[in-house]
């Protein structure tokens, strides 16, 4: 049996230069695995709590308390447990913390152990992680939702929408989808230069020009797709992450592109975009607690576009269940650090699929070289992954892992392509 023998932890840096937690787990059979925990810039209020140190060190963002929690409490609690019983291990972590938001020991400390245990168990079983988690039928390669133009909390510009993504839905394979996305990315750089706009990068590797607004950004990306010799809509679709909580103020409304708007007015704005651009997905179009607005928006345009819940659901089965009951969104963004254990993440995915919701696996803006989410995307058959631009090694690491998985699967590999969005046709395709 793959019994946990040793647990170690340390403080490392993420892609934004902020500290995060790395955990190592060793089993009695000699197997060893390591996991690093990501961190978000625009975080949902209802996410699992990251344990940070406060004080002057690293501007208060140190994670020595979380590391110590692993060494002093979490590690001793899981040593001796069977690593291939992930649910047992994760339940032990949840029980040990004893809070609904993992605020005592820290979601970052707990997640590091959860993921490292899963990796060690997979290695002990001599299985790739995607096969260990997903079983023998895991074979779907996801559409890469590439964030090639950054705004909002991911860039120091006046662009309110946080992410403008390209989705190579017409590619025949993941390797070709990655090539198409990379070529559009480079074409966008040329388009921006011709317009005299900045080609500096945001947190997730996308360009961060200070353009006039949403439609200006979408026009630039559409030009880049055509410049790369591809067809907007048929070959490469568009997607947005509005991260609307970031421009919502209680008592005021949505302060968006210089105008204060209601939820209904935001819905009208998005509806207008659908007729003009080949959009297949909009994430967080409204604020995280605007349940009524979300329900009305979903009823209005949910049959025309994928509506992804991130901050409103925070990968939490309880919040997702409420969303399903209220008709809120039609897809779930999956971020393992929002809920804090692999088991709870998989429970949320199962609930989403049973409720008829699509799932999109996602990175965070503060990433590491850890490639676990690439394996997770294939394991659950999500058909979609969001892990930044095809630039910066912490983003590219995930794409390269998916290339390896596609190669390992051989003839069994299937690229999701436009089947990842079966209910939504690009209106301008």
Swiss-Prot record:
Cofactor(s) needed for function: Mg(2+)
Residues bearing the modification Glutamate methyl ester (Glu): 45, 47, 50, 73, 126, 195, 204, 367, 369, 406-407
Coiled-coil intervals, chain numbering: none
Residues with PTM Phosphothreonine: 199, 341
Residues bound to Mg(2+) A: 241, 283, 310
Recorded phenotype for the gene knockout or disruption: Essential. Disruption confers a growth defect.
Residues at which phosphoenolpyruvate binds: 42, 162, 335, 364-365, 386
EC number of this enzyme: 4.2.1.11
Modified residues (Aspartate methyl ester): 72, 90, 123, 203, 210, 370, 375
Nuclease as UniProt keyword: no
Annotated keywords: Acetylation, Cytoplasm, Glycolysis, Lyase, Magnesium, Metal-binding, Methylation, Phosphoprotein, Secreted
Entry comment, domain topic: Binding of the forward (2-PG) and reverse (PEP) substrates occurs to largely overlapping sites. Binds (2R)-2-phosphoglycerate (2-PG) in two alternate conformations, the second of which has fewer interactions with the protein, which may facilitate its release from the active site.
Self-association state and partner proteins as the record states: Homotetramer (expression in M.tuberculosis H37Ra). Homodimer and homooctomer (expression in M.smegmatis); homooctomers were active while homodimers were not.
Misc: Probably binds 2-aminothiazole antibiotics, which are antitubercular agents. Overexpression (in strain H37Rv) leads to increased resistance to 2-aminothiazole antibiotics (2-AT), antitubercular agents. Reduction of expression (in strain Erdman) leads to increased sensitivity to 2-ATs. This protein may be a possible drug target.
Protein name: Enolase
Taxonomic source organism: Mycobacterium tuberculosis (strain ATCC 25618 / H37Rv)
The gene coding this protein: eno
């Amino acid at each position: 049996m793959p019994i946990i023998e040793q647990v170690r932890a340390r403080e490392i840096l993420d892609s934004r230069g902020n500290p995060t937690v790395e955990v190592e787990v060793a089993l009695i059979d000699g197997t060893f695995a390591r996991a690093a925990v990501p961190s978000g810039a625009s975080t949902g209020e209802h996410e699992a709590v990251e344990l940070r140190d406060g004080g002057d060190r690293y501007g208060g963002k140190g994670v020595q308390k979380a590391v110590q929690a692993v060494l002093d409490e979490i590690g001793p609690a899981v040593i001796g447990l069977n690593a291939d019983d992930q649910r047992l291990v994760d339940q032990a972590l949840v029980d040990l913390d004893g809070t609904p938001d993992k605020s005592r020991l820290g979601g970052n400390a707990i997640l590091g152990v959860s993921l490292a245990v899963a990796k060690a168990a997979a290695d002990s079983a001599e299985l790739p992680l995607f096969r260990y988690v997903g079983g023998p039928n895991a074979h779907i390669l996801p559409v890469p939702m590439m964030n090639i133009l950054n705004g909002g909390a991911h860039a120091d510009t006046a662009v309110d929408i946080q992410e403008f993504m390209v989705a190579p839905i017409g590619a025949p394979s993941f390797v070709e989808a990655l090539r198409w996305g990379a070529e559009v990315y480079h074409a966008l750089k040329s388009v921006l230069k011709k317009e005299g706009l900045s080609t500096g990068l945001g947190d997730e590797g996308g360009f961060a020009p200070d353009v006039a607004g949403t439609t200006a950004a979408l026009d630039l990306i559409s030009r880049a797709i055509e410049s790369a010799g591809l067809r907007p809509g048929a070959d490469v679709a568009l997607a947005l992450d509005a991260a609307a909580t970031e421009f919502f103020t209680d008592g005021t409304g949505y302060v968006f592109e210089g105008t204060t708007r209601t939820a209904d007015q935001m819905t009208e704005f998005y509806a207008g975009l659908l007729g003009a651009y080949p959009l297949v997905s909009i994430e967080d179009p409204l604020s995280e607690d605007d349940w009524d607005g979300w329900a009305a928006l979903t009823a209005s345009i949910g049959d025309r576009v994928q509506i992804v819940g991130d901050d409103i659901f925070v990968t939490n089965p309880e919040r997702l269940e409420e969303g399903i009951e209220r008709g809120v969104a039609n897809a779930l963004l999956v971020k393992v650090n929002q809920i804090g254990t692999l088991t709870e993440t998989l429970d949320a995915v199962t609930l989403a699929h049973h409720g008829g919701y699509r799932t999109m696996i996602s990175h965070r803006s503060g990433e590491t070289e850890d490639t676990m989410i690439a394996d997770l995307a294939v394991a659950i058959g999500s058909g979609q992954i969001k892990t930044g631009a095809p630039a910066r090694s912490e983003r590219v690491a995930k794409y390269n892992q998916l290339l390896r998985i596609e190669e390992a699967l051989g003839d069994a590999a299937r690229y999701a392509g436009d089947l990842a969005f079966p209910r939504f046709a690009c209106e301008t395709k």
